[in-house]
Curated annotation (Swiss-Prot):
<dbReference type="Pfam" id="PF02390">
    <property type="entry name" value="Methyltransf_4"/>
</dbReference>
<protein>
    <recommendedName>
        <fullName>tRNA (guanine-N(7)-)-methyltransferase</fullName>
        <ecNumber>2.1.1.33</ecNumber>
    </recommendedName>
</protein>
<feature type="binding site">
    <location>
        <position position="85"/>
    </location>
    <ligand>
        <name>S-adenosyl-L-methionine</name>
    </ligand>
</feature>
<keyword id="KW-0808">Transferase</keyword>
<keyword id="KW-0949">S-adenosyl-L-methionine</keyword>
<keyword id="KW-0819">tRNA processing</keyword>
<feature type="binding site">
    <location>
        <position position="195"/>
    </location>
    <ligand>
        <name>substrate</name>
    </ligand>
</feature>
<keyword id="KW-0489">Methyltransferase</keyword>
<comment type="function">
    <text>Catalyzes the formation of N(7)-methylguanine at position 46 (m7G46) in tRNA.</text>
</comment>
<feature type="binding site">
    <location>
        <position position="110"/>
    </location>
    <ligand>
        <name>S-adenosyl-L-methionine</name>
    </ligand>
</feature>
<dbReference type="InterPro" id="IPR029063">
    <property type="entry name" value="SAM-dependent_MTases_sf"/>
</dbReference>
<feature type="binding site">
    <location>
        <position position="137"/>
    </location>
    <ligand>
        <name>S-adenosyl-L-methionine</name>
    </ligand>
</feature>
<dbReference type="InterPro" id="IPR003358">
    <property type="entry name" value="tRNA_(Gua-N-7)_MeTrfase_Trmb"/>
</dbReference>
<feature type="binding site">
    <location>
        <position position="163"/>
    </location>
    <ligand>
        <name>substrate</name>
    </ligand>
</feature>
<comment type="pathway">
    <text>tRNA modification; N(7)-methylguanine-tRNA biosynthesis.</text>
</comment>
<dbReference type="InterPro" id="IPR055361">
    <property type="entry name" value="tRNA_methyltr_TrmB_bact"/>
</dbReference>
<feature type="active site">
    <location>
        <position position="159"/>
    </location>
</feature>
Length: 256
């Protein structure tokens, strides 16, 4: 268990204040459902639409039936482990990780059709064979995956839903933290990146009170700087240009 000292105190203090001020509401109203509410986007170009019609069906996960015994069965060529990225946006991070780790399978969940079209173009261009895609409800996907099967879950610059009445749409909720604990292997990781201080505080507060996770930070630089080989997304670069510093939070699933 990490001892929170002065090296990590700034963000920990923020989380504690945020928890006292806001998270004392009854979270029973934060029912599991769609954590995404903005699926519309720009009109697709002809080739993008063609990829959505013809390539996506070969890569898309169908969760209306039972899950496989292990998610590695979803990939050909075979993989050794599987990771999940939720809300991959333009796909920069997911593509880079898939290329860097060919023996790992990746599931990318994204509700925006424009994001799907962008990543399909990169998958076609790079001939990537270790990515599967999911365009539905992330909560339903988390409930479907086999227990203790994922090596890692990434949530990179998610929609912060800043208005209080929309907080129930944030991905990080107590119920979803429990779902991640069920899905992750022992010592698997949940990694979270955001340049929105209030969402960082929200996430840290939820994970610090979760019995199945440990925050891995031992010094301030562990959350102030990206982890090694992190691929900055287009949104991340935009945030830096505008003077917003992201936090890079890592939480490890405790062994049973």
């Amino acid at each position: 268990m990490v001892t929170i000292d002065r090296r990590v105190q700034p963000i920990a203090h923020l989380a504690c204040n945020h928890q006292r001020a806001f998270i004392d509401m009854n979270e029973s109203v934060h029912h599991q459902g769609s954590f995404f509410g903005r699926r519309k986007g720009h009109k697709l170009r002809a080739h993008q639409a063609d990829l959505v019609d013809k390539l996506l069906p070969h890569l898309a996960l169908a969760i209306d039936g039972p899950a496989p015994a292990s998610l590695v069965e979803l990939f050909d060529p075979p993989v050794e482990a599987v990771r999940l990225e939720i809300g991959f946006g333009g796909g920069e991070h997911l593509i880079a990780e898939a290329l860097a780790h060919p023996s790992t399978g990746f599931i990318g969940a994204e509700p925006y059709v424009n994001g799907m079209a962008k990543i399909l173009a990169r998958i076609e261009q790079e001939n990537i064979r270790n990515i599967r895609l999911f365009a539905g409800d992330a909560a339903a996907l988390m409930a479907w995956v086999p227990a203790h099967d994922l090596n890692r879950i990434d949530l990179i610059h998610p929609d912060p839903w800043p208005k209080r009445r929309h907080w129930k749409r944030r991905f990080v909720q107590d119920a979803m933290v429990g779902a991640m604990a069920r899905a992750l292997r022992a010592n698997g990781e949940f990694r979270f990146v955001s340049d929105i201080d209030s969402y960082n505080a929200w996430t840290l507060a939820h994970l610090l009170r979760a019995p199945d996770f440990d925050w891995t930070a031992e010094r301030a630089d562990d959350w102030r700087k990206p982890w090694p080989n992190y691929t900055m997304t287009r949104y991340g670069r935009k945030a830096e240009r505008e003077g917003r510093r992201a936090a890079y939070l890592r939480f490890r699933r405790r062994a049973a």
